[in-house]
């Protein structure tokens, strides 16, 4: 499943729409987990979620936490609840308890040069598939001028 959650803007109708959409996504994700548990197919939900899961997922936590969309506790709670319900955050599982790895950097300032990024692009795997994740790569450009997007591709290799 390819997913895009718009970024929202704190205290605006856009953010209200985002917050109304997250429970609907959670309902579908619960259906996919149940399907795998019943012997059905495994699933992968991946894409730009526009939300960090924790302090490890953003270089500048303190100035952003609960001040900007994507770093609000109520958004973070949804992503973490999906993990509690059984989804595997493949990159975090493979990377371990480290800062980053980031997949998005603002075009403004020196964010890319200073690696002041956010980890907001995910691969959430159902449990059986998540156990088969073997490696990951973030396709970060070597130089600012080589960037084709403010995001870098996130790849995970699964042994199937």
Question: Where are the predicted features?
Answer:
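Active-site regions of metal-assisted phosphoester/phosphodiester hydrolases
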Residues: 1-160
